[in-house]
């Protein structure tokens, strides 16, 4: 190689980090702007006096017909059940639960299939609100970065309010208000502790697991997961004893007093049945 060619090669090599940085910024900056725009407008706009949720981005901009329920009208039992069922360390992590990610990898690697999901409520919120449904490493990277940024920007209570207003509880059933009307023929504010736990049970796979709520024939896994969520609520101290008793006594099937689990056992219990795919 001539000295001139060698010099050109070294010059290009020196420019490579700058080119990679430019590519990263071209991907990162628009995504961050989109995220923060979404945070600014997440308080729902009201075209007709009723609050609606607008999907900010994605393959198709869509107006979901989910009535917005303010935090003051969401029963504490619903918040407790969702946190216990979806993200037990929600109030401890900063958007991404790295311990849960590590454990999910270990459990799934050992099982040879997706058995345990690792996404936090914040990650699910970013994924469901700002990202397309297409799975890719780029989408996962944006989900992780978005969750970290969202947690820096928004309080935990606001995240929960947003999540409960946009999460899917069944086919075209978005938000806690629609779920309450669809499954229990009442408004979200009137949900009992038992009904809140039942809704939390189906969240990982609402389009499949909602059959138990629709038919009122509760599958064995539905009953086991109900007991697990009640157990986690008790361990985490998310509800008063009186509401915990109601969650057990009002259940549509027998719910005994489950033994207390240690922290490692609690994390290990966050698995899906064999035929389901981790989040």
Indicate residue ranges for each PLM-predicted region.
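Juxtamembrane regions of bacterial inner-membrane/periplasmic proteins
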Residues: 2-279
């Amino acid at each position: 190689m001539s000295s001139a060619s060698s010099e050109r090669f070294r010059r290009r090599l020196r420019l490579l980090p700058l080119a990679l940085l430019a590519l990263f910024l071209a991907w990162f900056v628009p995504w961050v702007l989109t995220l923060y725009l979404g945070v600014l407008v997440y308080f729902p706009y009201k075209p007709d006096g009723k609050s609606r949720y607008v999907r900010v981005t994605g393959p198709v901009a869509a107006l979901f017909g989910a009535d917005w329920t303010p935090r003051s009208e969401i029963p504490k039992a619903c918040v407790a059940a969702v946190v216990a069922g979806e993200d037990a360390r929600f109030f401890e992590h900063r958007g991404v639960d790295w311990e849960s990610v590590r454990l999910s990898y270990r459990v799934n690697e050992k099982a040879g299939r997706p058995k345990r999901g690792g996404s936090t409520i914040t990650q699910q919120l970013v994924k469901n609100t700002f990202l397309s449904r297409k799975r890719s490493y780029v989408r996962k990277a944006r989900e992780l970065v978005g969750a970290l940024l969202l947690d820096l920007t928004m309080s935990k209570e606001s995240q929960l309010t947003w999540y409960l207003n946009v999460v899917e509880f069944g086919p075209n059933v978005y938000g806690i208000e629609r779920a309450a009307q669809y499954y229990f023929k009442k408004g979200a504010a009137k949900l009992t502790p038992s009904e809140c736990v039942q809704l939390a049970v189906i969240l990982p796979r609402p389009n499949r697991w909602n059959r138990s709520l629709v038919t009122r024939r509760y599958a064995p896994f539905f009953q086991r997961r109900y007991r697990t969520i009640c157990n986690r609520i008790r361990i985490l101290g998310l509800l008063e004893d009186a509401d915990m008793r109601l969650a057990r006594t009002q259940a549509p099937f027998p719910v005994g007093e489950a033994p207390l689990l240690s922290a490692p056992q609690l994390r290990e219990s966050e698995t899906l049945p064999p035929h389901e795919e981790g989040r």
